[in-house]
């Protein structure tokens, strides 16, 4: 399921390479609604642009589906509570399947920590350094007049670490944060935007 049918069709190539049958394709602005209405699926995995995470998850839960959702699961606190309440009322799971917490490397490292390979973990350091320059053109754009795409537009309007769980999540898991221990203080800092600012101004022709 993808907003753009061509992107959804391209995924069929992966199935073909794996010697698997073609999947049903759903596309367009409301394609996910048709997908969620099916009675032969149990779980909807959401890896769309961030603004669509909540409406797709809400639709899936309302149609009796379990939900695995990429980070962030919602764009504000009210949407978070809406998902919690909906999950509880429908008795369906709504799980944040954070790719940098549950990828093979992170799960392997967590397994090693839990089995004492590192001894008693008393200090940890994590990071997520990611140059997005090669990817800006691959993010979904809403029509020909959208020069930035959803991701660059979001970075332009918001400051700071927009998905801190990439670097912090695996460390918190290894330290059992919220599984017997908890954070008492959190300090966050960032620098001014340089490369992103230049890129936005180059694409829009406007100073930001």
Task: Enumerate the language-model features and the residues they cover.
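Short, solvent-exposed loop/turn and secondary-structure capping segments
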Residues: 10-11, 56-58, 79-80, 135-138
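A short helix-to-beta-strand connector/capping loop
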Residues: 18-24, 89-93
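N-terminal Rossmann-like dinucleotide-binding module
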Residues: 1-18, 171
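Predominantly a Rossmann-like dinucleotide-binding segment in NAD(P)-dependent oxidoreductases
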Residues: 90-95, 100-208
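Non-transmembrane alpha-helical segments in soluble domains
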Residues: 12, 33-36, 45, 57-61, ...
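Residues that line or immediately flank small-molecule/substrate-binding pockets and catalytic motifs
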Residues: 2-4, 29, 48, 125-128, ...
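A structured beta-alpha segment of the ubiquitous adenosine-cofactor-binding alpha/beta core
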Residues: 23-42, 46
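Beta-strand-loop-alpha-helix segment that lines the small-molecule cofactor/substrate pocket
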Residues: 43, 49-50, 54-102, 116
């Amino acid at each position: 399921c993808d907003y753009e049918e061509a992107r959804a069709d391209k995924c069929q190539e992966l199935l073909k390479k794996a010697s698997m049958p073609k999947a049903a394709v759903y596309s367009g602005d409301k394609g996910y609604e048709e997908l969620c209405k099916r009675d032969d699926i149990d779980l909807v995995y959401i890896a769309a642009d961030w603004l669509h995470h909540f409406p797709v998850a809400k639709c899936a839960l309302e149609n009796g589906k379990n939900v695995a959702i990429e980070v962030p699961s919602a764009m504000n606190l009210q949407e978070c509570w809406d998902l919690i309440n909906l999950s509880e009322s429908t008795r369906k799971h709504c799980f944040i399947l954070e790719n940098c917490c549950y990828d093979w490397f992170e799960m392997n490292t967590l397994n090693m920590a839990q089995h004492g390979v590192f001894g008693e973990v008393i200090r940890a350091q994590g990071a997520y350094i990611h140059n997005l320059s090669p990817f800006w053109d691959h993010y979904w754009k809403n029509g020909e007049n959208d020069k930035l795409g959803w991701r660059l537009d979001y970075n332009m309007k918001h400051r700071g670490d927009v998905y801190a769980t990439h670097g912090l999540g695996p460390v918190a898991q290894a330290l059992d944060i919220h599984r017997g221990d908890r954070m008492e203080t959190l300090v966050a800092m960032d620098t001014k935007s340089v490369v992103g600012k230049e890129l936005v101004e180059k694409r829009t022709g406007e100073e930001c």
